């Protein structure tokens, strides 16, 4: 039976609960891996299932299932389970107007429009470039895509049907000359492989040439430097060091954190604004409506240097007496929704990258990120770095890690550029409470930090 019809057969009025909802997800995923020219994996993974929740007297009961022909009886079983629990303080679920959201954007251009052979052909088109370079060892190409349809209905009359789509690949390689090595990668993101091969090859060729000078580049002298961070580093910094601390569930029961993160507190320069916004179609953080049926809002976490908001599910908003922001997300139908980011970024400023670099007499330009982590303090492993002298780039240097304290770094941001970019990925994602990988995106412009620890 069609999934929308399955939802219409559910009778929430027969349940003696305060609130109930159901989310059905149908997902198709493809993963392809080539290692040193050999095909190691080529799999397609379809799934269909539902996640059901009921709330009564402050207690939740929930279940995931792939049996979609007995949803009413599943709800009745959940009602029986939750009724056995001792009542807690009643959670005042906010009242919403009945509303249906239909947001189908990708049916005509989804990754499913390409065959498995076409996806393998895209990967194989990259292999000659990797294999013809004598300095490259152990090259790998990883392709992954996902097309997902979601249906939702709640006992307070909210429903939706929307789709999500992304595709992309990593070309990963190690350059080795004597005992010197340098690891690099090229990341691709698109909606469908059709017509992508030619530009992907050109991008890979340029990336290999750009990486070669780093094989024998000198290692940076550890210390504190004035730095320009590019848009990819900006995104990692924003997500890892600030975005997670803006997720409101971290504040529940933590009075010290509530005090530290009071709305209106000055935390950075006036030219700094940080946003979480799911309304960016064709990004990996695309989210028109969350897994509780709340529209995703553009949420300012920092506006003009001051704490302006935080990310909420319905429950965290109720408990902190704030407003839901549409950030309740689950990785798939097997998980409950929790507070997660979407597209998290720093808004652009006015100066070009060239103008930012020209302002630095002695410093570093940090480009790209291999990985990063952090809460109150952060560490990021950059992909590349260049020495800046007298306002000009002066050659590559090897940098292992940049690090700092979040609030100190926010206050040390001097200038924000206008070269805005959001970085999406079809591989990896964000991990939280065993829900990994959840698709997100992050970015912003380049910006100057007055002082940062570099090693």
Set out the residue ranges of the language-model regions:
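N-terminal small-residue-enriched
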Residues: 1-455
């Amino acid at each position: 039976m069609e999934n929308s019809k399955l939802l219409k057969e559910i009778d929430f009025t027969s349940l003696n609960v305060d609130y109930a909802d159901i989310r059905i997800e149908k997902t198709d995923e493809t993963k392809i891996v080539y290692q040193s020219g050999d095909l190691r994996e080529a799999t397609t993974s379809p799934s269909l299932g539902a996640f059901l929740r009921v709330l009564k007297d402050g207690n939740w009961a929930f279940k995931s299932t792939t049996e979609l022909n007995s949803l009413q009886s599943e709800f009745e079983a959940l009602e029986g389970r939750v009724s056995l629990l001792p009542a807690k303080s009643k959670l005042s679920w906010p009242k919403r107007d009945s509303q249906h959201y239909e947001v189908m954007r990708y049916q005509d251009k989804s990754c499913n429009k390409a065959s498995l052979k076409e996806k393998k052909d895209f990967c194989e088109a990259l292999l000659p470039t990797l294999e013809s370079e004598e300095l490259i060892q152990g090259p790998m190409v990883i392709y992954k895509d996902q097309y997902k349809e979601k249906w939702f209905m709640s006992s307070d009359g909210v429903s939706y049907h929307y789709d999500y789509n992304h595709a992309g690949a990593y070309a990963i390689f190690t350059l080795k000359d004597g005992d010197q090595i340098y690891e690099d990668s090229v990341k691709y993101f698109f909606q469908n492989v059709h017509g992508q091969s030619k530009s992907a090859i050109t991008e890979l060729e340029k990336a290999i040439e750009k990486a070669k000078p780093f094989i024998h580049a000198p290692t940076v002298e550890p210390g504190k430097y004035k730095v320009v961070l590019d848009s990819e580093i900006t995104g990692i910094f924003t997500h890892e060091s600030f975005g997670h601390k803006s997720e409101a569930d971290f504040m529940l029961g933590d009075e010290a954190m509530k005090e530290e993160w009071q709305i209106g507190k000055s935390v950075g320069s006036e030219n700094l604004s940080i946003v979480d916004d799911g309304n960016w179609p064709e990004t990996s953080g695309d989210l028109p409506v969350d897994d509780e049926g709340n529209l995703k809002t553009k949420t300012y976490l920092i506006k003009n240097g001051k704490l302006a908001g935080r990310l909420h599910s319905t429950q965290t908003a109720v408990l902190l007496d704030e407003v839901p922001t549409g950030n309740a997300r689950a990785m798939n139908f097997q998980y409950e929704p929790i507070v997660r980011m979407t597209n998290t970024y720093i808004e652009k400023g006015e100066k070009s990258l060239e103008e930012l670099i020209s302002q630095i007499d002695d410093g570093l330009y940090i480009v790209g990120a291999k990985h990063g982590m952090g809460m109150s303090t952060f560490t990021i492993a950059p992909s590349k770095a260049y020495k800046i002298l007298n306002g000009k780039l002066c050659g590559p240097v090897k940098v292992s890690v940049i690090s700092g304290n979040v609030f100190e770094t926010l206050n040390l941001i001097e200038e924000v550029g206008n070269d805005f970019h959001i970085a999406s990925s079809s591989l990896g994602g964000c991990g939280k409470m065993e829900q990994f990988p959840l698709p997100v995106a992050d970015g912003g412009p380049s910006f100057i930090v007055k002082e940062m620890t570099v090693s």
